[in-house]
């Protein structure tokens, strides 16, 4: 990671000198998506933990060609002013794929007072859904692979799982009608990541890329028996180019 620790006197992170990218591009964790993004978390005040969707999503950082040539940073009107190479970042990625840290996602039971994880569940894709914690001791989360999972809040054990066949970003919600408790989830992916194409191995392919990004509202209750038919995978093969007949 780009910082070795946090200086508890100043509250500032202490930069890792081994990952300085002034002279040579470096893989940095976390990348610009952060170790946690906007996906909802859930707070358990009784247990003193936060159930947190987290991610390791690295990005290659290098200085712009202009800075390398002149040593001077100039502000760019009407564009991003990050001081790093943006236009050529795709080539930087291709040049450094062998050294890329593996992107991963996590569901963490995190103690915000100690900074210690009580438990961690690893997820094969980094861009997953928000979290719902219940008074019954369950933690629900949907993931990029399309699974809605209920975990034991004490140890992270998966107790129940349902394949929605669509990537999930939204958090589940719970409500009660006539004494019956329900859990609902809105499936569907969004953001630029969905349109970036197939992820590079070993990152798992998101369900919305495999089956199409068809959002659904699904509702569950104990004893519910409705089934969801498995869709056909989308054919994304490149068709054969037709013969050129122009002269």
Question: How should these model regions be labeled?
Answer:
Residues 158:
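Catalytic-domain carbohydrate-binding cleft regions of carbohydrate-active enzymes
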Residues 42, 132-133, 173:
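Conserved beta-strand position repeated across blades of beta-propeller domains
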Residues 139-142:
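Aromatic-lined ligand-binding clefts that engage carbohydrates, nucleic acids, or primary amines
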Residues 34-40, 169-171:
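Short alpha-helical segments and helix-capping/turn motifs at coil-helix boundaries
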Residues 124-128, 165-169:
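Short coil/turn segments at the loop-to-beta-strand junctions that recur within blades
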Residues 1-33, 42-49, 55-122, 176-247:
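Extracellular/periplasmic ectodomains of large secreted or surface enzymes and adhesion receptors
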């Amino acid at each position: 990671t780009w910082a070795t620790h946090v200086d508890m006197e100043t509250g500032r992170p202490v930069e890792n000198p081994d990952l300085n990218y002034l002279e040579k591009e470096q893989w940095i964790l976390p990348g610009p998506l952060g170790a946690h993004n906007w996906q909802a978390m859930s707070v358990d005040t009784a247990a003193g933990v936060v159930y947190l969707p987290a991610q390791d999503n690295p990005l290659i950082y290098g200085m712009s060609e202009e800075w390398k040539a002149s040593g001077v940073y100039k502000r760019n009107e009407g564009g991003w002013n990050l001081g790093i190479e943006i236009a050529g970042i795709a080539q930087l990625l291709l040049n450094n794929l062998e050294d890329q840290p593996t992107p991963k996602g996590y569901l963490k039971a995190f103690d915000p007072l100690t900074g210690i994880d009580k438990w961690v569940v690893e997820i094969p894709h980094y861009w997953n859904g928000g979290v719902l914690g219940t008074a019954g001791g369950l933690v629900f989360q949907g993931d990029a692979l399309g699974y809605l999972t209920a975990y034991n809040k004490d140890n992270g054990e998966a107790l129940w799982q349902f394949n929605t066949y669509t990537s999930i970003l939204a958090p589940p919600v719970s409500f009660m009608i006539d004494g019956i408790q329900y859990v609902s989830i809105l499936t569907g992916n969004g953001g630029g990541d969905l349109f970036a194409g197939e992820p590079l191995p070993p990152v798992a392919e998101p369900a919305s890329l495999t089956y199409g990004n068809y959002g659904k509202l699904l509702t569950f209750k104990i004893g519910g028996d409705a089934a969801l038919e498995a869709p056909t995978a989308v054919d994304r093969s490149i068709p054969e180019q037709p013969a050129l007949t122009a002269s």
